[in-house]
C-alpha cells in the first residue's frame, strides 16, 4: 500500500515525513492484537515484541497527554449479539480495548506531528480546532455535578478561559474516577462534561485543541474516508516538495 510515513522521535525536534510503501505481513485485527497482548494467542516473536513496544509507548503517550491537561472523557462501547434471524439477542457495554487505545494514541501522535509542522511553517490547512470552554458553561457544569453529589474541583469565582480549560479538565478527571468507583452515571456524567465544552470543528487557521491539550491538531490518518485528512495530506506533501499537485495558498 502507498502511504505517507512519519517515524516520530519523542522529544526530538521536527519529525521526518516521506512517501513510502508498506507490506502487510500479519492480519492484526483489533481482536487478534488484543488477544496477543492479553497472552491468549501467540504470534511470531517480532510481532509480539512490536505490539508490546507499541503498548508501552501508547501508555506513556496517554500519561503525558493527561498530565498536560487533556480531558478524560471515556464512554463504554455498546456491543450486541444477534440471533439466527438477525434480531438482537443480547446487548452489553464494555470498556474500550487496549488495542483500540494503542492505535488511538499513535494516531493522535501522527495528527499532532503533521499539524505541528504545518502550523510551524504557517501553512494553511484544515486544522481540527477545539477552543477553550466558556467559563459560564463550566460554572454550570460544576453546579450540576455538585447537585448530583459528584466531587468537583475548586474554581475561582471569576474564571478566565484559561481557568475554565483547566477546571474542565480537572472535572473530567474527577468524573472518570467517580464513575469508575461507583458505577453510577457511566454515560450521563461524561455527557454533562462534553455538553459544557465548545464543539470541535475544522478551521484553516490553527487555534489549538483544548480537549487534547494540543497546541496544533489536524485529522491526517484516514484520508480514504475523511476529506479533511486528504486536504492535510496534500498540504503536507506540497510543503515538503513531494507533490506536483498545485495547492492554492
Task: State the predicted function of each range.
Residues 1-249:
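Electropositive polyanion-binding surfaces
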Amino acid at each position: 500500500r502507498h502511504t505517507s510515513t512519519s517515524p516520530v522521535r519523542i522529544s526530538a525536534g521536527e519529525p521526518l515525513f516521506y512517501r513510502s510503501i508498506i507490506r502487510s505481513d500479519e492480519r492484526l485485527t483489533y481482536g487478534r492484537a488484543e488477544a496477543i497482548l492479553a497472552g491468549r494467542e501467540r504470534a511470531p516473536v517480532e510481532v509480539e515484541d512490536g505490539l508490546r513496544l507499541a503498548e508501552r509507548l501508547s501508555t506513556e503517550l496517554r500519561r503525558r497527554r493527561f498530565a498536560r491537561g487533556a480531558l478524560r472523557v471515556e464512554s463504554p462501547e455498546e456491543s450486541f449479539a444477534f440471533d439466527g434471524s438477525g434480531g438482537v439477542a443480547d446487548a452489553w457495554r464494555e470498556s474500550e480495548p487496549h488495542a483500540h487505545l494503542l492505535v488511538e494514541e499513535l494516531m493522535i501522535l501522527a495528527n499532532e506531528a503533521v499539524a505541528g509542522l504545518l502550523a510551524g511553517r504557517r501553512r494553511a490547512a484544515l486544522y481540527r480546532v477545539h477552543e477553550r470552554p466558556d467559563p459560564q458553561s463550566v460554572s454550570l457544569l460544576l453546579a450540576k455535578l455538585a447537585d448530583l453529589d459528584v466531587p468537583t474541583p475548586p474554581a475561582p469565582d471569576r474564571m478566565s478561559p484559561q481557568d475554565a480549560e483547566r477546571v474542565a479538565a480537572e472535572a473530567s478527571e474527577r468524573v472518570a474516577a467517580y464513575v469508575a468507583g461507583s458505577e453510577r452515571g457511566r454515560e450521563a456524567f461524561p455527557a454533562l462534561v462534553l455538553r459544557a465544552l465548545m464543539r470541535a470543528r475544522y478551521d484553516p487557521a490553527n487555534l489549538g485543541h483544548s480537549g487534547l491539550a494540543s497546541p496544533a491538531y489536524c485529522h491526517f490518518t484516514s484520508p480514504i474516508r475523511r476529506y479533511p485528512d486528504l486536504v492535510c495530506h496534500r498540504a503536507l506533501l506540497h510543503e515538503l516538495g513531494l507533490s506536483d499537485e498545485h495547492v492554492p495558498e
